[in-house]
């Protein structure tokens, strides 16, 4: 059973769903044009991940092996419907902005993958924590990519935060620089694809530097036995 520290490390860095597993790229590329959209989808995905992992872990002993995937999908779809209704009620502007990508959480490979690979084989608490940290790992990449694209494309940060947090959040909007015309590439999916590649490259460089700092284990020289 994985420890809490291992779950945090795997979810946020070593096995990050976006930068290592490369799962959920469709919403990652399409929705991360602004920090607000990225954060909204990240929170929704995290809630579904926690709920699906917890429920799958609780009922795993009663699910026949042959039909486990359809059952997992039904559980995920039910949770996505609940999240969609909540967002429709309390964050309607963001609900309209995210559009089809909210119900598409059902088909997100991250969620079904964690249900199959981890939740179905572990106790409820570790399963819920795995969902939490995998969701936060995905959300962190979404928000970081959204920040890069929003700054390059609009020169702003937290634009439209009131759609997620309420009217008071209009004060969070920061205009870093004024642009007469938008940097269109940053706002379109190809720009998001380049941004993801940039983040993956940075992560790989950091991993390589960390690996180089580790003391190399010297291999013990094995002497051949002489047989006479």
UniProtKB/Swiss-Prot annotation:
One Pfam annotation, family name? Rnf-Nqr
Q: State where the protein is found.
A: Cell inner membrane
Residue spans crossing the bilayer: 18-38, 39-59, 69-89, 93-113, 128-148, 182-202
InterPro entries xrefs: NqrDE/RnfAE, RnfE
Principal place where this protein is found?
Answer: membrane
Q: Which GO terms describe its biological process?
A: electron transport chain
What membrane topology does this protein have?
Multi-pass membrane protein
Write out the entry's keywords from A to Z.
Cell inner membrane, Cell membrane, Electron transport, Membrane, Translocase, Transmembrane, Transmembrane helix, Transport
> So what EC number does this one have?
7.-.-.-
Q: Name one GO cellular component term.
A: plasma membrane
Task: Say yes or no: keyword Cell inner membrane present.
Answer: yes
Family from the record:
Belongs to the NqrDE/RnfAE family.
Subunit and partners: The complex is composed of six subunits: RnfA, RnfB, RnfC, RnfD, RnfE and RnfG.
Describe its function.
Answer: Part of a membrane-bound complex that couples electron transfer with translocation of ions across the membrane.
What name does this protein carry? Ion-translocating oxidoreductase complex subunit E
Q: Which organism is it from?
A: Aliivibrio salmonicida (strain LFI1238) (Vibrio salmonicida (strain LFI1238))
